[in-house]
Regions:
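Charged, surface-exposed helical/loop "interaction arms" that form contiguous linear patches used
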Residues: 1-29, 49
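N-terminal/domain-start segments enriched in small and hydrophobic, helix-friendly residues
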Residues: 4-10, 79-80, 84-92
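Conserved ABC ATPase signature
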Residues: 9-17, 42-69, 89-99
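C-terminal lobe/lid and adjacent interdomain/linker elements of RecA-like ASCE P-loop ATPase modules
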Residues: 22, 96-141
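Conserved, well-folded catalytic cores of nucleic-acid-processing
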Residues: 23-31, 74, 108-111
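Long, charged, glycine-rich C-terminal linkers/tails
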Residues: 28-47, 84-85
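Residue-level signal for beta-strand positions within conserved beta-sheet cores that form or flank
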Residues: 30, 38, 80, 110, ...
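GG-anchored amphipathic helix commonly corresponding to the ABC/SMC/Rad50 NBD signature/C-loop
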Residues: 59-85, 108
Length: 141
């Protein structure tokens, strides 16, 4: 049983880390790398020769990594086409990373549907090609 578990983990771990690393490069830098736990959860982030435990990352970095993780899983599950729902995120993200994340939202949104619920639409105002719908508009549909 353990052998089958380990085989399944290996089958999913490498593609997940590869997708996560590719998505994270524009946000965290070109040499970013993540290490996973046995449960396929991010344990550490390495960048510029420094490795940081997940728990020691800033709130903004954790929030960004949570979104990147969803994007990576969506790419793997449906070959890039699974919808991703984001609920009022990026509140702890600085302006520079917010711009980088906006570019990433656009890139992912070209391959899959990305739905963002927010009470702060300004956080996502830099996402090219976005469609904004107010709650009033959504209720009338």
């Amino acid at each position: 049983m353990l052998r089958h578990r380990d085989t399944a983990r290996q089958r999913y771990a490498a593609p997940f880390v590869n997708a996560l690393n590719a998505l994270a490069r524009p946000v965290f830098g070109g040499d970013v790398d993540f290490q996973l736990s046995e449960e396929l959860q991010v344990e550490t982030r390495s960048h510029d020769g420094q490795t940081i435990d997940f728990g020691d990352l800033s709130g903004g970095a954790k929030e960004q990594l949570g979104i990147l993780t969803r994007f990576a899983i969506a790419q793997l599950v449906a070959g890039g086409g699974a919808p991703v729902v984001i609920d009022d995120a990026l509140g702890s993200t600085d302006a520079t990373r917010l711009q980088l994340m906006s570019t990433l939202f656009d890139r992912v949104g070209r391959q899959a549907q990305v739905i963002v619920f927010t009470c702060m639409p300004g956080r996502f105002s830099r996402v090219p090609g976005r469609t904004e719908l107010s709650m009033k508009k959504l209720k009338s549909v």
